[in-house]
Swiss-Prot record:
Protein name per Swiss-Prot or TrEMBL: Endoribonuclease YbeY
Family: Belongs to the endoribonuclease YbeY family.
GO CC annotations on file: cytoplasm
UniProt KW keywords: Cytoplasm, Endonuclease, Hydrolase, Metal-binding, Nuclease, Ribosome biogenesis, rRNA processing, Zinc
E.C. number(s) listed in UniProt: 3.1.-.-
Cofactor(s) the record lists: Zn(2+)
Gene3D superfamilies: Metalloproteases ('zincins'), catalytic domain
Originating organism: Neisseria gonorrhoeae (strain ATCC 700825 / FA 1090)
Physiological role: Single strand-specific metallo-endoribonuclease involved in late-stage 70S ribosome quality control and in maturation of the 3' terminus of the 16S rRNA.
Record text on cofactor binding: Binds 1 zinc ion.
GO molecular function: metalloendopeptidase activity; RNA endonuclease activity; zinc ion binding
Highest taxon of the lineage: Bacteria
Compartment(s) of residence: Cytoplasm
């Protein structure tokens, strides 16, 4: 019997990045776990040697509670990012490893995709990349920071085979 080839780069990638994925949402039409892994890894791979990210899909009520409790905004949002590395939480010797959590609300994502004329897959890809960039320290509060973050999102989306997420015509 023939043995399957082992590809060392895939083994190395799995050692470098772990995605703890949980779908606690009742929404239909959600991409596969491997897609979320691929999108998050595309953002991480050039800047972080190692990362452990929890990604949970929550229904609107729970997503709203997190947004209210942590951001003071009483509505469900599309994605929330919680970076463990912010501040002085971890000792310096492990700071090259990124730890964080993403919460995505599929109902909000699906509604936004329909309103914006995007495919659900494309919008999930964008928001996974967007949330991962937040974990990495990117932000969009100030205009100059927003330009940098949006440029990186556009680059990563195009590299993944998707159009510019900020253009209505999708090009």
């Amino acid at each position: 019997m023939k043995r399957a080839k082992k590809y060392p780069f895939l083994t190395l990638q799995r050692q470098r990045f772990h995605l703890n994925f949980e779908n606690a949402s009742s929404a239909a039409g959600i991409p596969a776990e491997r897609d979320f892994y691929r999108w998050a890894w595309s953002a991480l791979k050039n800047e972080y040697l190692r990362a452990d990210i929890g990604l949970i899909l929550l229904d609107e009520e729970e997503a709203r509670a997190y947004n209210r409790d942590y951001r003071g905004k009483d509505y469900a949002t599309n994605v929330l990012s919680f970076a463990l590395n912010e501040g002085e939480i971890l000792p310096c010797q492990v700071s090259e490893r990124l730890y964080g959590d993403l919460i995505i609300c599929p109902q909000v994502v699906l509604k936004e995709a329909a309103e914006q004329g995007k495919t659900p897959e494309r919008h999930f890809a964008h928001l996974t990349i967007h949330g991962t960039l937040h974990l990495m320290g990117y932000d969009h509060i100030k205009d100059d920071e927003a330009e940098i973050m949006e440029a990186e999102e556009i680059r990563l989306m195009r590299a993944a085979g998707y159009p510019n997420p900020y253009r209505e015509d999708g090009h």
